[in-house]
From Swiss-Prot:
Organism this protein belongs to: Pseudomonas putida (strain W619)
Necessary cofactors: [4Fe-4S] cluster; [2Fe-2S] cluster
Taxonomy, superkingdom: Bacteria
PROSITE patterns (UniProt xref): RADICAL_SAM
EC number: 2.8.1.6
Protein name: Biotin synthase
Annotated binding of [4Fe-4S] cluster, by residue: 59, 63, 66
Cofactor note: Binds 1 [4Fe-4S] cluster. The cluster is coordinated with 3 cysteines and an exchangeable S-adenosyl-L-methionine. Binds 1 [2Fe-2S] cluster. The cluster is coordinated with 3 cysteines and 1 arginine.
Keywords recorded for this protein, A-Z: 2Fe-2S, 4Fe-4S, Biotin biosynthesis, Iron, Iron-sulfur, Metal-binding, S-adenosyl-L-methionine, Transferase
Gene name per UniProt: bioB
Radical SAM core domain span: 44-262
InterPro entries (UniProt xref): Aldolase_TIM, BATS_dom, Biotin_synth/BioAB, Biotin_synthase, Elp3/MiaA/NifB-like_rSAM, rSAM
GO molecular function: 2 iron, 2 sulfur cluster binding; 4 iron, 4 sulfur cluster binding; biotin synthase activity; iron ion binding
């Protein structure tokens, strides 16, 4: 099974085709992914974004991976919606350290009418700084989507998380079709889409393939496809799940690159548990977007200077804003604070 390196994109992938890609010899898969990547991107440029949690904890959703859910006791401090001025100060700091995207994430099922005016002011203020804006606020209705677009929001993150078949085992408070509807509203409003999923929740290979099929078979591919590795947090139902095999994670990135050749594939939550060698393999597999800074919502993220040191060693440079208009920021799945252990490839956050 091989993937085309032409500019043609497909929206009719089958499960058998995608599983065949996953089952390729590792070197062959990476070669194909890197070849496709080079046909559409500079292989030595990686887009960087900063993420800020503007409202933390007490979410009414029951996502089993998430410490921000009000259904679980994870010890995460609940916080109200951040003041607009504070958000703008954080955005200015993000711009100063080199970010070109600023994403604001709120732990909501959906934004309320009373919060929307503040959210819209955040978008306008960040946009005025010359940063590209993105948000993840949960489910949106059509009016909210239009309001965000009119305020200048560039990108909206709404993950599918996993396959339709496995989804009900992870979340019961929001349906898969509701997620797809929000994505449709976002696209109709003229904004760009960031949507991906999580590995390590107990899903099968069919589920991993099924997630990518859902994304690749959308009428338009998401501009950004975040691939998250579960960060296991004590108190959540998935705290004792087995670690993801690092080669399986790299395979997921590579297949995402083959199915969605023009999308930015984001190395997302879980990067804290990856050593430099694994991150280098991720870039070889076609990942070309990361978070930059100290925190990823409620999960620790490698320090910014450490990221830049790795970039220098690999000959990678941050992607400048003007070099592309089709990147989206991903508000990676909310997880709890995890200490950095750079000497280990993975470690169980539940033991911290």
């Amino acid at each position: 099974m091989s993937a085309s390196t032409t500019a043609t994109t497909r929206h009719d992938w089958s499960l058998a085709e995608v599983k065949a890609l996953f089952q390729l010899p590792f070197n062959d898969l990476l070669f194909q992914a890197q070849t496709v990547h080079r046909a559409h991107f500079d292989p030595n440029r990686v887009q960087v974004s900063t993420l800020l949690s503007i409202k933390t904890g007490a979410c009414p959703e029951d996502c089993k991976y998430c410490p921000q859910s009000g259904h679980y006791n994870t010890g995460l401090e609940k916080q109200k919606l951040m003041e607009v001025q504070k958000v703008l100060e954080e955005a200015a700091r993000a711009k100063a350290i080199g970010s070109t995207r600023f994403c604001m994430g709120a732990a909501w099922k959906h934004p309320s009418a009373k919060d929307m005016p503040y959210v819209l002011e955040m978008v306008k203020g960040v946009k005025a700084m010359g940063l590209e804006t993105c948000m993840t606020l949960g489910k949106l209705d059509q009016d909210q989507t239009q309001a965000l677009a009119q305020a200048g929001l560039d990108y909206y993150n709404h993950n599918l998380d996993t396959s339709p078949e496995f989804y009900g085992s992870i979340i019961t408070t929001r349906t898969y079709s509701e997620r797809l509807q929000t994505l449709a509203y976002v696209r109709d409003a003229g904004m760009k889409i960031c949507s991906g999923g999580i590995l390590g929740m107990g899903e099968s290979l069919d589920d991993r393939a099924g997630l990518l099929i859902q994304l690749a078979n959308l009428p338009e591919h998401p501009e950004s496809v975040p691939i998250n590795m579960l960060v296991k947090v004590a108190g959540t139902p998935l705290a004792e799940e087995e670690d993801v095999d690092p080669f399986d994670f790299i395979r997921m990135l590579a297949v995402a690159r083959l199915l969605m050749p023009k999308s930015h594939v984001r190395l997302s939550a879980g990067r804290e548990q990856m050593n430099e060698q694994m991150q280098a393999l991720a870039f070889m597999a076609g990942a070309n977007s990361i978070f930059y800074g100290e925190k990823l919502l409620t999960t620790a993220n490698p320090q910014a200077d450490k990221d830049m040191q790795l970039f220098a060693r690999l000959g990678i440079k941050p992607e400048a804003r003007e070099e592309h208009a089709d990147e989206v920021h991903q508000a990676a799945i909310e997880q709890a604070l995890v200490e950095q252990r750079s000497s280990e490839l993975f470690y169980n956050a539940a033991s911290a």
